[in-house]
Amino acid sequence: FVYNALCAATVGTLLGLSKEQIENGIKTFELTKKRMDITELKNGVTIINDSYNASFESMQASLKYLSGLNAKRKIAVLGDMFELGEYSKELHEKVGKEVVKNKIDILVCCGDSAKYIVNMAKKEGMPKEKVFYFDNKEQIEKFIRENAQNGDSVLFKASNGMKFFNIVENLIK
């Protein structure tokens, strides 16, 4: 955010805005919701809400980000990527490979196409006891409430239509 704010301030200066106008713009700026929103829960669990949209590339980037965190355990809660047409199976399987490549500790999935993520992660060597598939969001919420621990980071990533943001909102309450 800092680098983006500096760039915006520079552009504002070039366009003739006053320092007060630039400062006010930066103070009142709000990031887009459901895109890498980070919240720390009272129990010490970090929630990363990236549930606004999902493509293979954004899944890949989010998993890479999660893998780089200094967390006790890295938990990826992944759902379907919509609008992939004939490439859906292939791209969901590639996400499963990315989960293993990025050394995610626990994989939690929901959605018809997310089954391909689960199957490929297992095929690529992720231990079966670290991979969970649920039929609905309520089961995911219950699982995270009961299993996420102090120091864990939990990424929520799916197409907006999966409504994973509802899980995040319930966990934050």
What are these regions (language model features)?
Residues 7-173:
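ATP-dependent carboxylate-amine ligase
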